[in-house]
A protein has these predicted regions:
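Residue register of alpha-helical TPR repeats
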Residues: 138, 177, 211, 218, ...
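Short C-terminal boundary/hinge segments that cap the last helix of small helical domains
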Residues: 86-103
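Amphipathic alpha-helical segments of tetratricopeptide repeats
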Residues: 121-128, 160-168, 197-205, 234-245, ...
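A short, Lys/Arg-rich alpha-helix, primarily the initiator
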Residues: 1-44
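Short alpha-helical DNA-recognition segment
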Residues: 45-65
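DNA major-groove recognition helix of helix-turn-helix/homeodomain DNA-binding modules
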Residues: 74-91
């Protein structure tokens, strides 16, 4: 199913009927929303309030009262202000339907319907006139979601400035989504404390969004708070089953497997991951399969079952094996533990020659090389460098 953007317009009535409806909408719309929209347009265009006041032949305080919602803005005033800002206001976009579109995109994100989600986002981006309408803040919330979820290197600072001006007009569900995406942004920056603050704000507005609980369990897993992680995994699984979100359910169960692994329940971790591996093959989910196999290689290492470790490693697609330095590390350790030092050093050399390798892995692999060469002092220096890298 693809969301039909034609439904965001207020209808196809004859022009006189449309004008009447536009007038009614304009009269009934929240003055604060209009004020925030006009202010955010002015801020985005970097236009001083003095210039707006001069063009409208009113005082700056009058413009300020319009922007704060103390005074209502007529359609004529809206048009004049937008004209000064170099845009024209679109009165046809139905904000309620755009709110539904925000929820629809977020649902697709929750369900891992990535292609469908991105297709809808692209349609929104192609209709940039929405950015100067009653649904302006929904438009920028969608752009912000796109920037963070897809990590597309887009500068989201402008989106955030606009959304901070307009968030007071959001529904509770929109606010919950907004703060959840802010939390996700901080998660990508490894700022778990700030991410948790935003997640707490998100759940104040809606405590039943699947991704809110999923993000909680991911953070607590990373922090080592396993009791809390288990609490949110269970809640996430409960919501996923209720919403029939089977794609996301697989990744939730993957988190459960990581929790078993982190609490040294290796048999449970292996059994769950093997069941998920079977499911990933049925669904032809290559990325899920790669995540599961990575876990199984690590489980095999920790259980000292090196034969299984090599078996699972051979099942990993080569494209992932070259880019995932955790897997590269597992492969080196497998050869190291079976005393195949020649191959271990070969893979270390290959990794160190890769320009994309990070400082942590570079130091760690050099440490392993020095250990193989029985150069313990240099190995210790490299390990200390690893810790320094983590601290910085």
């Amino acid at each position: 199913m693809v969301y039909d953007l034609r439904c965001i317009y207020i209808g196809n009535e004859p022009s006189f009927a449309l004008e009447t409806k536009v007038r009614d909408v304009s009269n009934n719309i929240n003055r604060s929303l209009i004020g925030n929209i006009l202010k955010s347009i002015r801020v985005e265009k970097n236009i001083p309030m003095k210039k707006i006041a001069s063009a409208l032949k009113v005082s700056e305080s009058t413009v300020s009262q319009i922007e704060t919602g103390k005074n209502s803005a007529t359609k004529e005033k809206i048009n004049e202000i937008c004209h000064v800002c170099g845009c024209s206001f679109d009165y046809k976009t139905d904000r309620k339907k755009m709110i539904d579109l925000v929820l629809y995109i977020y649902t697709q994100y929750s369900n891992l319907s990535t292609d469908e989600m991105n297709s809808t986002i692209e349609e929104v981006k192609n209709n940039s006139f929405i950015s100067c309408s009653y649904a302006r803040f929904e438009y920028y919330l969608i752009l912000y979601m796109d920037g963070i979820i897809n990590q597309n290197n887009e500068d989201v600072q402008l989106f955030k400035r606009i959304l901070e001006i307009g968030k007071s007009s959001f529904s509770n569900k929109e606010l919950s989504i907004y703060y959840d995406i802010k939390a996700l942004e901080k998660m990508y920056l490894n700022d778990s404390i700030k991410a948790l603050e935003y997640l707490n704000q998100s759940r104040l507005y809606d405590n039943e969004f699947l991704m809110n609980h999923y993000h909680y369990c991911s953070i607590y897993l990373n922090l080592g708070y396993y009791t809390l992680a288990q609490k949110y995994i269970r809640k996430s699984i409960e919501i996923a089953i209720k919403e029939v979100s089977f794609e996301r359910l697989c990744y939730l169960l993957l988190n459960q497997g990581v929790l078993y692994l982190s609490t040294e329940q290796y048999v449970e971790a292996e059994n769950l991951n093997l069941k998920l591996l079977k499911e990933s093959k049925i669904r032809n989910e290559e990325f899920l399969k790669y995540c599961i196999l990575s876990n199984l290689v690590l489980i095999s290492l920790l259980q000292k079952n090196y034969e299984n470790g090599f078996k699972y490693l051979e099942m990993v697609d080569q494209k992932y094996l070259e880019d995932d330095y955790d897997l590269v590390l597992y492969r080196i350790l497998l050869h190291l533990f079976v005393k195949d030092y020649t191959l271990a050093k070969k893979y270390i050399r290959q990794s160190l020659s890769n320009n994309s390798i990070g400082k942590y892995y570079k130091n760690f692999f050099q440490c392993l090389k020095y250990l193989i060469d029985n150069k313990r002092e240099k190995a210790i220096e490299r390990i200390e460098s690893c810790y320094n890298t983590l601290e910085n």
